[in-house]
Amino acid sequence: MKNIIILIINTGSSSLKFTLYEYQYQSEQILASGIIEKIKTTQAIIKIKFKNKFLELTNLNIKSHKKALKHLIKTLTNKKTKIINYLDQIQGIGHRIVHGGAKFKNSVIINQNVLNELKKISHLAPLHNPIAIKVIEEMFILFPNAKQVACFDTSWHQTMNQKAFLYATPYSWYKDYHIRKYGFHGLSYAYITKRTAIILNKNIEDLNLIILHLGNGASINAVQKGRSYDTSMGLTPLEGLVMGTRSGDIDPTIIPLMSKILKKTTKQIENILNKESGMLGISCKSNDLRDIWIESNNNEYNSKLAVEIMTYRIKKYIGSYLAALDFNIDAIIFTAGIGTSDYEIRKLSLQGFEKIGIKIDFQKNNLAIDKNTEYDISSNQSNIKILVIPTNEELTILEDTYDLIKDN
């Protein structure tokens, strides 16, 4: 198969991100990219970049994702944009799916059986999967000749051993109800592992890594022999590191206790842990680390504390994953928005590890602030490489989609 046009879709609860690519093996060109925001309102916005131009449409009445897709098609094919001439030019559609459960170990071409399986596990990601399924079903109607592919944030972690993914709860919970650690950010970790192999000139199967995906949502991944070995997020993205609005690890008895004290339902407490905790909860000001740093540098107590708690949790996870990998690693990699731009967080996260030979070059680290550039910030005296690599989850989806549809 030669050059083909592939549409990448990332469905949010009230948004639809998209990128249209012309792709040939290991060579891609972006034809258009954009987002439809504030879906389910009369103030919806479409932003799209194409051919060095930018188009923004505001105050649109887009009451559903179904209507958002129709607006997207209209935008891609209208005479003003001329991005594509007709819909059948799009031969593949790649979807980012948050949760694939234990069923989906790799990206798959979507058929009715796949849709049925996705519906069975919708309860594992109730805010994301059901909407993504509706979008897929609608796209079968709108793009009858295109192959659709599901790419899962959880698939990468399906190589974890039971000792890593099982909770110490009754085994029947796992057997009967599939309660276990699944992990997320897998599309990011897959890309970073592949990129690191190229940078270090090593075979992927020879790589042992610790990767930190630090954004508003944050997690850490231990990679052994090029495969996911353990990760900080769990059944849901709430477990693990301190994030923008998520608490990360807590004692589970906090939930019924605060439910009783605050006279709120457990669902409401869960919502607080997901949307009002983390950096926002501790700082009492913002989930944006840039705002928190401004307050912290002015000696504001809660903002300083938020940074300390966040980086302390990161250090604990790095230390535990070093031990889990028998202290045999090739590199520590920082990625995502905070990981690629915040040199202070990187420095604090690795503070103390110089005693076991993991050493940052502070000058290199301070200069590593361009989110689109790869950096080696390790000291010449470091036993391992410390890298900053921007992630590209879309490229993982694009390549998986191409690989699956090229011969079909």
Curated annotation (Swiss-Prot):
Mg(2+). Can also accept Mn(2+). Keywords: ATP-binding, Cytoplasm, Kinase, Magnesium, Metal-binding, Nucleotide-binding, Transferase. One of its GO terms (molecular function) is acetate kinase activity. GO terms for biological process: acetate metabolic process; acetyl-CoA biosynthetic process. It catalyses: acetate + ATP = acetyl phosphate + ADP. Coiled coil: none annotated. It is found in: Cytoplasm. Its cofactor is Mg(2+); Mn(2+). The keyword Kinase applies. Mg(2+) binds at N10, E393. SUPFAM superfamilies: Actin-like ATPase domain. Pathway: Metabolic intermediate biosynthesis; acetyl-CoA biosynthesis; acetyl-CoA from acetate: step 1/2. It is an enzyme of class 2 (transferase). Pfam families: Acetate_kinase. ATP binds at K17, H213, L214, G215, N216, G217, D288, L289, R290. InterPro entries: Ac/propionate_kinase (IPR004372), Aliphatic_acid_kin_short-chain (IPR000890), Aliphatic_acid_kinase_CS (IPR023865), ATPase_NBD (IPR043129). Its EC number is 2.7.2.1. Homodimer. PANTHER family: ACETATE KINASE (PTHR21060), ACETATE KINASE-RELATED (PTHR21060:SF15). Belongs to the acetokinase family. This is Acetate kinase. The lineage of its organism: Bacteria, Pseudomonadati, Spirochaetota, Spirochaetia, Spirochaetales.
